[in-house]
Amino acid sequence: MDVDTRLLRYFAAVAEEGSLTGAARRLFVSQPALTKQIRRLEDDLGVPLFARSRSGMALTEAGRELAVRVPALLDVWDEAVRATARAARVLRLGFLDAGAVGVVHEVIAEFRQAQPEWRVELRQFDWSDPSAGLAGGEVDAAVVRLPFPGQEALEVRELFVEERGVLLSARHPLANSKTVEFRELWDEPFVAAGAETGAWRDYWLATEEREGHPLRVGAVTNRPDEWLGAVAAGCVALAPASTARFYSHPDVVFRSVRGVSPSRVGLARPRGRKREAALDELLEAIARRLSRS
């Protein structure tokens, strides 16, 4: 029998969290999607793994047996993937948006000249995974925007901060302002990331800076092109200043905002993992360049 390792990761998260809500938040997936995947694993194995009730998810006897073995299985698989990448001399670097990556392409080009035996793969993830692939073990390190759920389990090095401003439709009454007070936006419909992104979503909605004022969500998306389209159609969105340089739309303008904290950009990698000298060299070069940018 072949079982998708992603299903095992989902199972392990629900078993450890004791609820779909906590596991969905940790995995950056929606609760309905997680429920569907757990059902799929149960169908594949032919046994119920959880007893479901209003108070949460309790492991069945079969589920407890699997829960004991899954962490070791996943550890072995993850190490096999890493060993394969090392043997192939591949470094995988995740990112979310071009603005955060900035001059990384130049650093990678220089690294390839200095270390021609290594290949660097840049992998872009959408906003449904603010860890940029680290949560699922899909990358070796990532350029990330802080804060995001699960970052306390990672080794994170903050590199720089940049202004958070607002994206507005060019037809918006505030579009001609050089600077906007955040309170002027409180009643506007905001573009939000999916609820599964937790603290990431809250940060980009500036929920802590609304002084209790209720939030209006006008659109939900995890993709930059849909995000810009929603703004052009009349929603508003907080965004880092670099967005104006790397993403554009003829009907969208970027304006400075007073009353919100800046965006922080960092490098993240798993804790406690065997260090690869080539990866250390690459990340140090990226850190130096981004810190100066």
Where are these regions (language model features)?
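Acidic, Gly/Pro-rich loop/turn segments at junctions of secondary structure
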Residues: 114, 125-187, 245-247
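Hydrophobic hinge/microswitch elements
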Residues: 126-131, 135-139, 145, 194-255
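Secondary-structure junction motif
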Residues: 145, 178-182, 188-211, 275-283
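Central regulatory/effector-binding core of bacterial HTH transcription factors
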Residues: 88-149, 221
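A late-sequence structural motif
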Residues: 103, 245, 253-293
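Short helix-boundary/capping micro-motifs
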Residues: 12-30, 46
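Alpha-helical linker/hinge and terminal dimerization helices associated
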Residues: 44-45, 65-91
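A short LG(V/I)-centered, amphipathic sequence patch enriched
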Residues: 40-59
